[in-house]
C-alpha cells in the first residue's frame, strides 16, 4: 500500500468541537440521561401496573372458572346419581305396572271364563226349560186331544165337581 497517499489526504482525528458535533451529542445524551428515565419510567410503571392488574384479573377469572368447574362436576355427579335413581325407580315402577297388568289380565280372563261357563249353564238351563215347556204343551195337547174320547158325560161332571171341591178346600 501507499502510505504517502494516506498522509497527504488528511487521515486523522479532528479535535475541533464545533465541527465534530460532540457538543450536540453530549447535550442529547445528557438530556436523554436526565429526562428519559422519569418519562420512560412513568410509562413503564403504568404498563407494569396494567400488566399486574391484568394478571390479577386473569388469576381471579381462573379461580372463578376452577370453582365453577368443581361446582359443575359436583352438579354433574349429583345429576348422574339422580338420573340413575330415577332410572332404577322407573324400572321398579314399570315392573310393578307390568305385574299388575298381568294380574288384571289373568283376573279378567278368569272372569270371562266364569262368565262363559255361567252363560253356558244358563243357556243349558234355558234350553232345558224350553224343552220342558214344549214337552208340557205337547202332553197337554195330547191329553186334550185324547180327553174327549175317554170321558163321557158323567165322568166329565165328576171331574168338574172334584175340581171345584179341591178349589174350595184350598
Curated annotation (Swiss-Prot):
Keywords: ATP synthesis, CF(0), Hydrogen ion transport, Ion transport, Membrane, Thylakoid, Transmembrane, Transmembrane helix, Transport
Zinc-finger recorded as keyword: no
InterPro entries given in the database record: ATP_synth_b/b'su_bac/chlpt
Pfam families found in the cross-reference section: ATP-synt_B (PF00430)
Region (Disordered): 72-98
Residues annotated as transmembrane: 15-37
This protein's record includes keyword Thylakoid: yes
Molecular function in Gene Ontology: proton-transporting ATP synthase activity, rotational mechanism
Main location as per UniProt: membrane
Superkingdom of the organism of origin: Bacteria
Cellular component, GO annotation: plasma membrane-derived thylakoid membrane; proton-transporting ATP synthase complex
Membrane topology of the entry: Single-pass membrane protein
Protein's cellular compartments: Cellular thylakoid membrane
Function: F(1)F(0) ATP synthase produces ATP from ADP in the presence of a proton or sodium gradient. F-type ATPases consist of two structural domains, F(1) containing the extramembraneous catalytic core and F(0) containing the membrane proton channel, linked together by a central stalk and a peripheral stalk. During catalysis, ATP synthesis in the catalytic domain of F(1) is coupled via a rotary mechanism of the central stalk subunits to proton translocation.
Family the UniProt entry places it in: Belongs to the ATPase B chain family.
Quaternary state and interactors: F-type ATPases have 2 components, F(1) - the catalytic core - and F(0) - the membrane proton channel. F(1) has five subunits: alpha(3), beta(3), gamma(1), delta(1), epsilon(1). F(0) has four main subunits: a(1), b(1), b'(1) and c(10-14). The alpha and beta chains form an alternating ring which encloses part of the gamma chain. F(1) is attached to F(0) by a central stalk formed by the gamma and epsilon chains, while a peripheral stalk is formed by the delta, b and b' chains.
Protein name: ATP synthase subunit b
Organism: Prochlorococcus marinus (strain MIT 9215)
Phylogenetic placement of the source organism: Bacteria, Bacillati, Cyanobacteriota, Cyanophyceae, Synechococcales
Amino acid at each position: 500500500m501507499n502510505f504517502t497517499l494516506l498522509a497527504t489526504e488528511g487521515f486523522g482525528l479532528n479535535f475541533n468541537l464545533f465541527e465534530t458535533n460532540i457538543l450536540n451529542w453530549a447535550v442529547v445524551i445528557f438530556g436523554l440521561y436526565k429526562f428519559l428515565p422519569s418519562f420512560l419510567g412513568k410509562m413503564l410503571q403504568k404498563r407494569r401496573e396494567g400488566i399486574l392488574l391484568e394478571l390479577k384479573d386473569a388469576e381471579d377469572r381462573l379461580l372463578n372458572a376452577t370453582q365453577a368447574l368443581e361446582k359443575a362436576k359436583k352438579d354433574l355427579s349429583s345429576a348422574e346419581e339422580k338420573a340413575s335413581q330415577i332410572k332404577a325407580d322407573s324400572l321398579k315402577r314399570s315392573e310393578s305396572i307390568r305385574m299388575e297388568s298381568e294380574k288384571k289380565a289373568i283376573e279378567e280372563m278368569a272372569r270371562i271364563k266364569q262368565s262363559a261357563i255361567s252363560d253356558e249353564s244358563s243357556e243349558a238351563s234355558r234350553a232345558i226349560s224350553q224343552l220342558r215347556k214344549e214337552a208340557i204343551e205337547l202332553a197337554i195337547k195330547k191329553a186334550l186331544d185324547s180327553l174327549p174320547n175317554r170321558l163321557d158325560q158323567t165322568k166329565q161332571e165328576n171331574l168338574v165337581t172334584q175340581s171345584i171341591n179341591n178349589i174350595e178346600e184350598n
